Structures are given as C-alpha cells and as structure tokens.
Amino acid sequence: QISSRYNDVYEVENLPDTDYGEITAFIEQNNIAIKDDLTFSEYLPQKSDFHQRVKYDFPPLAIALKDYNAVRKMLGYEPITLQTDEFATHWHRAAEDKDIENYIAKHTLLETDAGTLKLSENAVFQEPVGESIYNLYTDVVYIIPDEIAQVLLPVQSNRFVMTQYPL
C-alpha cells in the first residue's frame, strides 16, 4: 500500500497528483508478477475541511463505494451495498466497540458538498484493510456512493498492489 497525503499541503492547487508511474516502472523492471493492482482517490466530504489542521481533529476521509468494494474484493471480502443517499463507515481494527458506538450515535448524518447522506442500516465495517486509507489521527473512513464522490475534493491518492508471490 502506498498513499499520498494532503496533510502537509496548504493550498488545494498544490495537492499531489501522481499516477505512481515510478512504482509501475519498478514492478516492470523487476518482473514482479501482480495478482491485483488498484489506484483510487479519497475525498474530503466538505472542501471547507481542507484547512482543518488541528492534531487529533483531522476530518475523516471518504472513499467511493466502487473503490471500497474493489479493496474488499482484493482482500477476499464480500462487497457491500449502499443506497444513493446513504453512507457507511470502515473502522481501524484498534478502534474500541464503545468508541465506534458513541461515534455512530452522534454521526447519523454526513454533510457533504454534494448533499446530506444518512447512515446506512448496515453501517459499520472493521475488516483489516491496511493503514493507508485513514486520515492522520483518525480511525474511520466514510464509504459513500460513487455519484457523491465525483463531486468532492480528492485529497489523497492510494495504490494497493498485491503480488502473485511473496517478495
């Protein structure tokens, strides 16, 4: 897993824009057999949160449903579904059940630049997916409909590569 971070970028126009070409070149030069390869973006639900830089108060990021399901498939998990006006959450494995319950109770709606989403009935996922999908100092990522993601500000790029054989 490789990801860019927006946290040290202070202007939207300076956000990293990478296609991870150097990774592709390394894979090709070393004849590494690839089983799965996925590049995707994560978004701020509200662009106004871009300048929120208080340690331990960074906003959670959002991932488009199609990308989240592609990650799940890559890792052998079943896909999830959402209605067009719903969101779900994916939690870091270290997050405590009590903390998740408290957060969910206070966050039944998600305000985005594309409108308000309501919490899905099946809203909490916690399978291991790696560290790079979470924003700094957060244990949760929002899963949102693809149509909503298309309207939001992409701030982080991720590339997940699974090799055919252990390196």
Question: What is the meaning of each model-derived region?
Answer:
Residues 2-167:
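Basic-flanked hydrophobic alpha-helices used for secretion and membrane insertion
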